[in-house]
Swiss-Prot record:
Assigned protein family: Belongs to the FMP46 family.
Keyword annotations from UniProtKB, A to Z: Mitochondrion, Oxidoreductase, Transit peptide
EC class of the enzyme, as a word: oxidoreductase
Predominant place of localization: mitochondrion
Span of chain positions assigned to the transit peptide in the UniProt entry: 1-21
Free-text function comment from the UniProt entry: Putative mitochondrial redox protein which could be involved in the reduction of small toxic molecules.
This protein's name: Putative redox protein FMP46, mitochondrial
Compartments where found: Mitochondrion
Gene name as annotated: FMP46
Other information: Present with 1240 molecules/cell in log phase SD medium.
Length: 133
């Protein structure tokens, strides 16, 4: 946890990117695990918009599993990474991204920003976030 958040006793934020939590089994399992943690060490943010250019770059370069997780979630990742940071794709509703083939509706994407963790699997949430002391 960052020094500033520690002083303020604020939990870190974990984002779950999903186009439709109701129809995505992996996203449902991820959310269930995250919400089931009673330690209050983190807040859960449900993101239904495509990551911003900055977020995408952070996940890709700062998180060890970033490139693999992003490739599973964003089928056209190589093309998207070439877009200008002002491209309307960044911040676009994920449902539109699914329709355009830019977002895999069967995957989940979660990000623990502070600990530089990113993944697609619910089991990794348990392994890297819930069990982490």
């Amino acid at each position: 946890m960052s020094f500033w958040k520690t002083l303020q006793r604020q939990p870190r934020t974990i984002s779950l990117f999903t186009n439709d939590i109701a129809s995505n089994i992996k996203s449902q399992k991820c959310l269930q695990l995250l919400k089931g943690d009673v330690s209050h060490r983190f807040d859960v943010e449900i993101a239904n918009r495509f990551p911003t250019w900055d977020q995408l770059q952070y996940m890709r370069t700062s998180c060890p599993q970033g490139p693999v997780s992003l490739q599973r979630q964003i089928p056209k990742l190589d093309s998207v990474l070439k877009y200008k940071h002002t491209d309307p794709t960044f911040g676009m509703d994920l449902q539109k991204c699914v329709q355009r083939g830019l977002w895999n509706p069967k995957e989940a994407l979660w990000v623990d920003w502070e600990n530089k963790l990113v993944g697609n699997e619910p089991a990794d949430i348990d392994k890297y976030i819930i069990q982490r002391k």
